[in-house]
Amino acid sequence: MKVLVINCGSSSLKYQVIDSETEHVLAKGLCERIGIDGVLTYQPAGQDKIKYEAAMPAHRQAVELVLKQLTNPENGILKSIDEIDAVGHRMVHGGEKFACSTLLTDDVLKTVESCNDLAPLHNPPTLVGVAACRELLPTTPMVGVFDTAFHQTMPPEAYIYGLPYEYYEKYAVRRYGFHGTSHKY
């Protein structure tokens, strides 16, 4: 099974294609400087990096370029985007709503969007990346892997800050424990 993994940052998009059965990385790369003079880096397994400038006014175009590169007849690792069996998206902030990786349905995406105030630099571009993937790969399952999910088992005495409790109740101010995917996977 080939899984495309995407991590949308505020002005970048990191990606890998992984064979989930062997856990081998088949290709990886990075779209940098999204919104200005974009640069795409692509590296098939066991080969040198390929780097070129490309117009990427937004994350949508970055996703399109990644899919185009992965299916490039000269050095792409896929004959067709239909070979992508699933897409995993790094989701920075799911608030207290998600305690595990989650299939990205319309309802889930609305809930993630409601957490945008908690991660204003990360959640919006991630949601744009998810929307682009859903449009370009409409029958491919999309899964969100939440940074905040790993730490959902912290007891309240570990996640409540020494601030007025109303900040937690009103603004969801608490310790979330980020980079959970680095701990779990």
Please report, for each region that a protein language model flagged, where it lies by residue.
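Short glycine-rich, Thr/Ser-proximal phosphate-binding strand/loop in the N-terminal lobe
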Residues: S12-M56
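ATP-dependent carbohydrate kinase catalytic cores
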Residues: N123, L127, R134-Y185
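Short glycine/proline- and acidic residue-enriched helix-loop micro-motifs
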Residues: K51-Y52, T111-N116, E169-V173
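Electropositive phosphate-/nucleotide-binding environments in soluble metabolic enzymes
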Residues: M56-R60, E64, T102, D106, ...
